[in-house]
C-alpha cells in the first residue's frame, strides 16, 4: 500500500497549498466581491472569424486559460478563428508563422501564473456570473488543418480542454495541467502526452511510432484504429485503477506488488506497428 499512501499524501498536500493560495488571494484583494469587480472590469471578449493562415509544417502553442480545437479543413489551406476572453489592455492571442512553424501564444497570462495579478484575472470563478457564462460559451480557439502530415506538433495548456480531429503528425507532444484531451481520427508518430488532471479519450486512434502517455488524475479511454488494433504493442500501468481490454487483443494482466495497481501488456504477432506505454496514477485505462 505504499503507492496509495504516497498518492493520498500528495493529494492532501496539493489541496492544502491550494487552500492557502486562495486565502492569500482573498486577503490581498480585499475579499471575493472586490476581486470579482477587478477581474470583470478588466476582461473583454475578443472574436476573430475564420481567417486563412500562411503555410506551415509544424505547430507550437502555449496557452494558459483557453480551449483549443483542431478540425479538418474543407480545402488545402489552414485557417484560424477564436472567440476568447482577454484583458482590455491588449489582444489575448499572438499568432505568427515563422520558418514554417505556426506559433500561438497567450498574451495575457504566463503558463505558470507567477504573480497575483495574473491569478486574479485568470481564475474563472473570480469573474461575475455573466462574464463567466460568456467565457464558457465563447468556444476558444479553432484551428482548421488540411489533410497533410505535420512534422511536429507541440501543445501546452495550463487550463483548458484540447480536442483534435483528423490530425497527422510525425512528432506530437501535449501537456495539459487542468483539462481533458480528446483525439479522433488521429495518426501520431513519436508522441508524448502528459495530463495532470483530466481525462483522455481517443477514437480511431493510430500510433505508428513510440508513444508515451501519463495521466496523473483521470481516466484514459481509447478506441484504436484497425492498424493499431492489430499491430500495436501495449504496456499499460495504473497505480490506483482498473485496466480493461477486449479479449481479442490477446493481452494479459500481469502480477504486481501492489494490491491497488494493475499492469497489462499486449505483444502482437509479427513486427509491431507502434509502441504505446500508458500510465494512469489515479484512474482507469479502458481499451475498446
Predicted regions mapped to residue ranges:
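Positively charged n-region of N-terminal signal peptides that target proteins for export
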Residues: 1-6
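Hydrophobic membrane-insertion alpha-helices, especially the h-region
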Residues: 7-26
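Short linear S-[DN]-x-LW-Φ motif typified by the pepsin-like aspartic protease active-site region
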Residues: 26-107, 140-146, 150-152, 161-167, ...
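Structural motif
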Residues: 64, 96-98, 158, 177, ...
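Acidic/polar low-complexity surface segments
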Residues: 113-134, 247-266
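Right-handed parallel beta-helix
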Residues: 153-196
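Short, surface-exposed interaction patches in beta-rich subdomains
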Residues: 183-288
